[in-house]
Amino acid sequence: MLKTLENLQLFAHKKGGGSTSNGRDSQAKRLGAKAADGQTVSGGSILYRQRGTHIYPGVNVGRGGDDTLFAKVEGVVRFERKGRDKKQVSVYPVAK
């Protein structure tokens, strides 16, 4: 009887977990509008963060190297249509 127990092999009754190629996600880039239509902004304020030109710069608005739109002067923000299928954002100074 002892000889049969010597050859006894124990196997796992649950398989190993293994690995997966999922489980990662990039951080959100916080893109989109940073100023609303009709809002008063100061010069240099970021109006819209984007990748590419979803919205084009209008009056008194500049475009940064990463396509971010920013106000060149202090004024009121206006989101407008540019032709049939494009949009632009402009900043109009407030008359004092």
Curated annotation (Swiss-Prot):
Residues 13-36 are annotated as: Disordered. One of its GO terms (cellular component) is cytosolic large ribosomal subunit. InterPro entries: Ribosomal_bL27, Ribosomal_bL27_CS. GO terms for biological process: translation. Coiled coil: none annotated. GO terms for molecular function: structural constituent of ribosome. The keyword Ribosomal protein applies. Keywords: Ribonucleoprotein, Ribosomal protein. Belongs to the bacterial ribosomal protein bL27 family. PANTHER family: LARGE RIBOSOMAL SUBUNIT PROTEIN BL27M, RIBOSOMAL PROTEIN L27. This is Large ribosomal subunit protein bL27. It comes from Streptococcus thermophilus (strain ATCC BAA-491 / LMD-9).
